[in-house]
Amino acid sequence: MGIWLNESSVDGFILLGIFSQSQTDLLLFSTVMLVFTVALCGNVLLILLIYTDPRLHTPMYFFLSQLSLMDLMLVCNIVPKMAVNFLSGRKSISFAGCGIQIGFFVSLVGSEGLLLGLMAYDRYVAISHPLHYPILMSQKVCLQIAGSSWAFGILDGIIQMVAAMSLPYCGSRYIDHFFCEVPALLKLACADTSLFDTLLFACCVFMLLLPFSIIVTSYARILGAVLRMHSAQSRKKALATCSSHLTAVSLFYGAAMFIYLRPRRYRAPSHDKVVSIFYTVLTPMLNPLIYSLRNREVMGALRKGLDRCRVGSQH
């Protein structure tokens, strides 16, 4: 328990947040809460559809259900505390609460980054090696892929949480952010953080750049396979399948790399807070919409579920 006992552990920290009490910020807060509600409902609905409809019991939808679960946990880790602080006017967070928020946040973002990379590999196998797909992406392999994403993400979260909470915070208690994010917290440390910066960069390389390189390689090969297809309809179907994943990848990795891979001298709290909204709130809302509205199987499962509910209510 020693890592929790330093100069800031008694009082904790103050989250300055992203909203003030102005009319404009009240409107922005209402918008964020609407986005949070859509993210919550969308991801829960997508998980239920994938779980209950046998037609969606395929590797791609299994990975999608894991992605939705990660997104669901991510928004629930950040937004409720932000809402309580804004509505109550109390912006404090305990030292232990800050550490727990960091642990969950880093674990979920790391897991999602790895899973998105491995989902690109799944699309590559499905398009380039369709005959071998059932063997290469068996149930055992799918469980191993999902399990490894969760395991490495959780390990990354524990490492960064322990390292961040071990630093002394004897100066300002004001975190210029709406949640405990590592780069914002490090600015308050009254010790040399160069070793931690190196550790953070190494974790980001493994959890962001490595899966991103898998995505780039997979889609380069997918593009080559698509161009070799003789049927225009097959090319269109393959590109439609991949476009949803590419949209989700662009939103997630664009925001995460902007926050974690920039040199410290180029970081500005106002920019970081706005960009963080993208992968903590906006991406979890957009993912179920991106993957469902452009997907016939998911929309078919949704219509089937609604029809079942309608018939049940009539009886």
Curated annotation (Swiss-Prot):
Gene expressing this chain: Or2v1
Q: Does the keyword Membrane apply?
A: yes
The cross-references to InterPro entries, in alphabetical order and at most eight, read: GPCR_Rhodpsn (IPR000276), GPCR_Rhodpsn_7TM (IPR017452), Olfact_rcpt (IPR000725)
Where does it reside?
Answer: Cell membrane
Organism, per UniProt?
Mus musculus
Recorded GO molecular functions are: G protein-coupled receptor activity; olfactory receptor activity
Matching entries from Pfam families are given as: 7tm_4
Q: Name one GO biological process term.
A: G protein-coupled receptor signaling pathway
Q: Which UniProt keywords apply?
A: Cell membrane, Disulfide bond, G-protein coupled receptor, Membrane, Olfaction, Receptor, Sensory transduction, Transducer, Transmembrane, Transmembrane helix
Where are the membrane-spanning stretches?
Answer: 31-51, 59-79, 100-120, 145-165, 196-216, 239-259, 273-293
Q: What is the lineage of its organism?
A: Eukaryota, Metazoa, Chordata, Craniata, Vertebrata
Q: Kindly give the membrane topology term recorded for this protein.
A: Multi-pass membrane protein
Q: Which Gene3D superfamilies match?
A: Rhodopsin 7-helix transmembrane proteins (1.20.1070.10)
State the function annotated in the UniProt record.
Odorant receptor. Activated by (+) and (-)-limonene.
GO CC terms in record: membrane; plasma membrane
Family from the record? Belongs to the G-protein coupled receptor 1 family.
Q: List the disulfide bonds.
A: C98-C180
Instruction: Kindly provide the name given to this protein in its UniProt entry.
Output: Olfactory receptor 2V1
